[in-house]
């Protein structure tokens, strides 16, 4: 059974060209945003009786990917494996992009801006309907990836 969140998102995406733009640009937005968030890390130590039992160096990109994986799994348990693969590829590729590409932040910001511009072009010129984020920004960011 499809959720009301899916219907909300679906009503803004009927044009084939706009859907095609979204097919390429939404993953690029998620990927570039993950690249940006990967650069924000949190170093944590969990001590027990004065000894480190867990040391993590987790970046915000991973936290967001885990959040989305949990959200989609909660909505429909059948989405776990596809979203695990999708978000795993997004996270790992963005992590290694940052690791091996000089000025990766600049590239990620440019890709993000370009992808957002393409989204609006898709809605304004092809869909001829405003983007879903105008009506509900939270629904848009929850359903988009």
Segments predicted by a language model, with ranges:
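Membrane-proximal soluble regions of multi-pass membrane proteins
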Residues: 3-8, 12, 124-145
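Hydrophobic alpha-helical transmembrane segments of multi-pass integral membrane proteins
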Residues: 25-36, 110-114
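Juxtamembrane "helix exit" motif at the C-terminal ends of alpha-helical transmembrane segments
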Residues: 31-49, 88-99
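Non-cytosolic membrane-interface motifs at loop->transmembrane helix junctions
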Residues: 52, 103-107, 131-138
């Amino acid at each position: 059974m499809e959720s009301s969140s899916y219907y909300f998102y679906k009503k803004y995406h009927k044009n084939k060209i706009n859907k095609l733009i979204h097919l390429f640009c939404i993953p690029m937005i998620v990927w570039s945003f993950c690249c940006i968030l990967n650069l924000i890390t949190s170093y944590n130590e969990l001590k027990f009786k004065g000894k480190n039992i867990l040391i993590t160096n987790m970046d915000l990109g991973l936290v967001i990917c885990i959040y989305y994986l949990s959200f989609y799994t909660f909505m429909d348990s059948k989405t776990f494996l596809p979203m695990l693969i999708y978000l795993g590829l997004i996270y790992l590729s963005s992590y290694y992009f940052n690791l091996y590409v000089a000025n990766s932040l600049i590239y990620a910001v440019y890709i993000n801006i370009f992808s957002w511009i393409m989204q609006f072009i898709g809605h304004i010129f092809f869909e001829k309907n405003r983007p879903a984020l105008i009506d509900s920004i939270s629904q848009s960011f929850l359903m988009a990836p």
